[in-house]
Amino acid sequence: MQTNTQFTGLEKRIDEAAHRLLDNLPRHRISDALTEFLVFGLKQAWACLFGGAMLGLIILTRWFWPEGGAGFITRYDFLFLSAVVIQLGMLVFKLEAWEEAKVIIIFHIVGTAMEVFKTHAGSWIYPEENFFRIGGVPLFSGFMYAAVGSYMARINRIFDIRLNHYPPLWTTIVLAAAIYINFFAHHFVWDMRWVLFAATFALYWRTSMHYRVFRFRHKMPLLVAFLLTSLFIWIAENIGTWSKAWLLSLIHISE
């Protein structure tokens, strides 16, 4: 069982209620495996709370937003203001720790800056007009990056993640810097993403992630975790493309 210091107040009460319910179930290998699988899915959904809410709003506005606009507010501004309200609500109702909110702010700022560059470079466009924007970038877009930051911070906390055979920190810093540089530089020079993929594999192929689900700790290669996370981000990006939140060709999985 995780220590209570890793939970918000609400999460602590949920965890205690889950133990009261599930600890009374008959114990054998099948029921233990099913319990771990169920709790794993629920915790993943909890970690994706902000990102799931944002993606849900993007889909709903794709289906139900008036074709000519809502008059008093644009779709992009509605998404931006909704994201702000969701974040405030998560903090007020203790669905999120303050440390996670700080991560979200950082990811939003960095993500918005990246969006400004990418739209200027012509990678994609935001076709609709709105008020809350910087250049051609509506501010709701930064919250899509923030959703990734939220997930990373929350999953590390609620799964009590520990890493074995992690390479020296400086190597991660160098790799991250190279990835960000390539994000901008590949518009002007050779795209080295495949070199970066190879470097990522070389650095982390021995690293394993240990995490607690409910009763037991489990182990997963860190590269598998990277792959699964990237896959779901790719799916979410293509849902955003389908919803016409931005305009570009469907994103290739190598992106």
Task: Indicate where each model-derived feature is located.
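Residue-level detector of conserved catalytic or cofactor/ligand-binding positions
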Residues: 249-255
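N-terminal membrane topogenic signal
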Residues: 34-51
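Membrane-interface helix-boundary motifs at transmembrane edges
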Residues: 91-102, 156-167, 211-220
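Transmembrane alpha-helix boundary signature
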Residues: 67-69, 92-101, 116-128
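Hydrophobic, lipid-facing residues on alpha-helical transmembrane segments of integral membrane proteins
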Residues: 52, 56, 101, 105-117, ...
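Short aromatic-rich membrane-water interface segments that cap or initiate transmembrane helices
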Residues: 130-144, 254
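Alpha-helical transmembrane segments in multipass membrane proteins, preferentially the mid-helix core
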Residues: 86, 149-157, 179-186, 198-217
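Central hydrophobic cores of alpha-helical transmembrane segments in multi-pass inner-membrane proteins
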Residues: 80-91
